[in-house]
């Protein structure tokens, strides 16, 4: 049996508490399902700065590059607000993305039936929502040059950011979108602003050409990004996989997440290029929520996003689709049973802490795996 190597980077704040619940699930996957996961641990963020003077050490970066996948908790907190910019905790995540060459960011927006009432939208609009936003992560306006503020010499200044995409960047993210759609409902909606942006014109052309060349079996539609934002709120269930660039993906993924009414419960994945020999992609999985330093150490953090990140890892890095399905079903089942951490609790439900929520999900997962 091939080994499955995981690097766990709990990080700061509630990261270690949430990761502790993931370790329980991994232990079960090994002891009862004999899946052979090998885990290593490392430091990232503020705790890495405290130990090494940098947001992630070279040694832990090497571990990340050698692993089949990385599970990442959260970084940052007031303790490190005054550290130098170049070693700030968030830099650890940025270095992981850069050195692992993770260019595809997957942000699911899933509405658990038991939490449909938490959305600001009508239940009939949101119930059963399951869409995936695929954001290009390493190009576009966040990385384009020049990027500067210049003094015009007349009392005025000019801020410059550059939106730039090359054909290969568009083609490779399009490939990921079409591949993902085949495992879902076989539809991709590509969003850009081709009406006012040349990069949008090229994006549209590149996605269209790639579709015709390699993915004609998948349904493709194009939509202007502003119209896409409107449609996300009007009728989100029309979408399956939304493909878009770095800037629009940043905006649209947060809009889609809040449709579910549970931003802090959603996972994400960042994938790199497929290895030419093994076909495997470098990958990092993390909850969407932050480090929540205000509740760290209190035992009340919600571990669902971290556990759901493990489910994404099982699905996309290891092809363990049945196990991923069961773990996601376990999360939904526990919510159906009325078990809630404080952040999602309401009258009539049972309030539990981090450990109790993790134990409940594991028990449900074990029952589904029997």
From Swiss-Prot:
Catalytic reactions of this protein: (2R,3S)-3-isopropylmalate + NAD(+) = 4-methyl-2-oxopentanoate + CO2 + NADH
Entry GO terms, CC: cytosol
Protein localization: Cytoplasm
GO biological process, one term: L-leucine biosynthetic process
GO molecular function, one term: magnesium ion binding
EC number per UniProt: 1.1.1.85
Record-listed NAD(+) binding positions: 77-90, 290-302
Record's cofactor remark: Binds 1 Mg(2+) or Mn(2+) ion per subunit.
Pathway terms, separated by semicolons: Amino-acid biosynthesis; L-leucine biosynthesis; L-leucine from 3-methyl-2-oxobutanoate: step 3/4
Binding site for Mg(2+): 226, 250, 254
UniProtKB keywords: Amino-acid biosynthesis, Branched-chain amino acid biosynthesis, Cytoplasm, Leucine biosynthesis, Magnesium, Manganese, Metal-binding, NAD, Oxidoreductase
Residues the UniProt record annotates as site (Important for catalysis): 142, 193
Top-level taxon: Bacteria
Enzyme kind, highest EC tier: oxidoreductase
Coiled coil: none
Cystine bridges: none
Signal peptide as annotated in the record: none
Binding residues annotated for substrate, in chain numbering: 97, 107, 135, 226
Cofactor(s) of this protein: Mg(2+); Mn(2+)
PANTHER family assigned: 3-ISOPROPYLMALATE DEHYDROGENASE (PTHR42979:SF1)
Its job: Catalyzes the oxidation of 3-carboxy-2-hydroxy-4-methylpentanoate (3-isopropylmalate) to 3-carboxy-4-methyl-2-oxopentanoate. The product decarboxylates to 4-methyl-2 oxopentanoate.
Protein name: 3-isopropylmalate dehydrogenase
Organism: Brucella melitensis biotype 1 (strain ATCC 23456 / CCUG 17765 / NCTC 10094 / 16M)
Underlying gene: leuB
């Amino acid at each position: 049996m091939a080994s499955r190597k995981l690097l766990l980077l709990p990080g700061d704040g509630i990261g270690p508490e949430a990761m502790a619940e993931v370790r329980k699930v991994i232990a079960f996957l090994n002891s009862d399902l004999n899946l052979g996961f090998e885990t290593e641990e490392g430091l990232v963020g503020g705790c890495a700065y405290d130990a090494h003077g940098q947001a992630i050490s070279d040694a832990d970066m090497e571990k990340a590059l050698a692993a089949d996948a990385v599970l990442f908790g959260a970084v940052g907190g007031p303790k490190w607000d005054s550290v130098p910019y170049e070693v700030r905790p968030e830099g650890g995540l940025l270095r992981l993305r850069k050195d692992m060459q993770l260019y595809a960011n997957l942000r699911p927006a899933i509405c658990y039936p038991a939490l449909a009432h938490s959305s600001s939208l009508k239940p009939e609009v949101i119930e059963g929502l399951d869409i995936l936003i695929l954001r290009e992560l390493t190009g576009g306006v966040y990385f384009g040059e020049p990027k500067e503020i210049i003094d015009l010499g007349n009392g005025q200044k000019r801020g410059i950011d550059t939106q730039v995409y090359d054909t290969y960047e568009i083609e490779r993210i399009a490939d990921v979108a079409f591949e993902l759609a085949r495992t879902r409902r076989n539809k991709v909606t590509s969003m850009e602003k081709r009406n006012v942006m040349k990069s949008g014109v090229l994006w549209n052309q590149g996605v269209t050409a790639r579709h015709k060349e390699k993915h004609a079996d998948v349904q493709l539609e194009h939509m202007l990004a502003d119209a896409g934002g409107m449609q996300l709120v009007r009728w989100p269930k029309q979408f399956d996989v939304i493909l878009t660039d770095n800037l629009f993906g940043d905006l649209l993924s947060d809009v889609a997440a809040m449709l579910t009414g549970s931003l802090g419960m959603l996972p994400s994945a960042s994938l790199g290029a497929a290895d030419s020999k093994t076909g495997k992609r470098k990958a990092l999985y993390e909850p969407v929520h932050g480090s929540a330093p205000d509740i760290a150490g209190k035992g009340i953090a919600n571990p669902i996003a971290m556990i759901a990140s493990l489910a994404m890892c099982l699905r996309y890095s290891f092809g363990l689709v049945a196990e991923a399905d069961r773990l996601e079903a376990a999360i939904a089942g526990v919510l159906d049973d009325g078990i809630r951490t404080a952040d999602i609790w309401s009258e009539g439900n049972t309030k539990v802490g981090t450990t109790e929520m993790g134990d409940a999900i594991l028990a449900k997962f074990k029952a589904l795996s029997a």
